[in-house]
Amino acid sequence: ILVDSRDPVGPGIGLFRAPFYKDCAAALKKGGIFVNQSESPHQHPDIIKGIYAELRKAYRHQGMYLAHMPTYPTGCWSFAFNSNDVTVQEGIQRAAKGTKPIETKYYNRELHAAAFVLPNAFRKQVEA
C-alpha cells in the first residue's frame, strides 16, 4: 500500500495516526509493505519522530528512505517503509531479486539500496 497524502496537519492528521496505520496493516497480504510520505527530515524532525511513534503501534518493522524531490522544500523528502513480515533489508533484497535491471537516466539498484542509508541525525528521528 502506497499513501502519498497531504501533510500531517489539519484534516490530514488522521492519515498519520495509529488507527489508520492499523487499518492499512490489516489490509496487507502476508509479506506486504506499507509506504507513506513522512515529510522533510531537514525541516520537520519532530513531526517525523511523531510519525514513527505512531507507525510503531501498527508495524514491527520500520525504516526511512530518502528521495530527491527538487520541487519540495529542501529538495530532500522522506518516506516510511513499514511491514509486519518484511524487514527493510529483506525488502531491498526482494526488490533487487524480483526485477530486471532497466536503463534509466536516474534509477539503478544501487541507488535503491542507498536510499535507505541515512545520516545519523535522520536515524535518530526514526529511532526516537
What are these regions (language model features)?
Residues 2-4:
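A conserved beta-strand element that flanks and buttresses the S-adenosyl-L-methionine
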Residues 7-8, 39-44, 70-71:
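Short "lid" loop at the C-terminus of a central beta-strand within the Rossmann-like core
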Residues 8-16:
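Glycine/threonine-rich flexible loop motifs
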Residues 16-30, 56:
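A short glycine-rich, Lys/Arg-flanked "PGG" loop and its adjoining helix->strand segment in the class I
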Residues 31-38:
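Conserved beta-strand signature within the Rossmann-like core of class I S-adenosyl-L-methionine
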Residues 46-59:
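Short alpha-helix
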Residues 53, 74-128:
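SAM/dcSAM-binding transferase cores
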Residues 60-70:
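Conserved S-adenosyl-L-methionine
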